[in-house]
Amino acid sequence: MDAKIKPLRAGKSADARTDFQPAELDPSEFLAAAVQPDQPRPSRAEAEAAVKTLLSYIGENTEREGLLDTPRRVVEAYDELFQGYHQCPAEVLDRTFGETAGYDDFVLVRDISFTSHCEHHVMPFYGKAHIAYTPVERVVGLSKLARLVEIFARRLQTQEHLTAQIAAAIDEVLKPRGVAVMIEAEHTCMSVRGIGKQGASTFTSRYTGMFRDNPAEQARFMSMIRNRG
């Protein structure tokens, strides 16, 4: 059975705080592209040279046939894996639809698969994100929530930060009655290095508005995630 690591919830013990409020994120951190077009960056040649240096550091012969094109390939892979730095999360959520026909419950999109990289070891972590929000008059296209996850995932992250950024972006742009985000993921920095424990899953969650204030809504959100019937 997979190990499950879950955050402590307020109210789980007599000593748990019930007045805790999560720290606010700076909107400039999650609403705009992280890299601006005029921002100074190393050249591609410098990036490839850095890869070559790392290969030499581990003891490889960078002139052997199998590694001649590796620096170029690694830089090209980084361009793809970290393209989220050049994309704007707010733009993804900008287009909304007003035809809700009086719908007043939350919208849930679950099992959004993603792969990201931890900022500590630059190693992959991967899993699924589950997102719910309760709209006020307008809704966003469902694919946009998956796209939002993809943008933030394609940056160096911690799972906690990724969870908070997704919730904060939806909260800031859509102004819903509440947002709930849960992420479950496996971290290769834990499974293939260090302690080497494969199959361990990490769970993180973030609630705002009605979800934060109403434990019954949190429970319903969790139930709908787990109910596969």
Curated annotation (Swiss-Prot):
Protein name: GTP cyclohydrolase 1
EC number: 3.5.4.16
Organism: Rhodopseudomonas palustris (strain HaA2)
Family, per entry: Belongs to the GTP cyclohydrolase I family.
Pathway: Cofactor biosynthesis; 7,8-dihydroneopterin triphosphate biosynthesis; 7,8-dihydroneopterin triphosphate from GTP: step 1/1
Keyword hit for Zinc: yes
Binding site for Zn(2+): C118, H121, C189
Gene Ontology MF term list: GTP binding; GTP cyclohydrolase I activity; zinc ion binding
Pfam families on file: GTP_cyclohydroI
Region (Disordered): 1-21
HAMAP family: FolE
Coiled-coil zones: none
Subunit-structure text: Toroid-shaped homodecamer, composed of two pentamers of five dimers.
Gene Ontology cellular component list: cytoplasm
Domain of life: Bacteria
GO biological process, one term: tetrahydrobiopterin biosynthetic process
Catalyzed reactions: GTP + H2O = 7,8-dihydroneopterin 3'-triphosphate + formate + H(+)
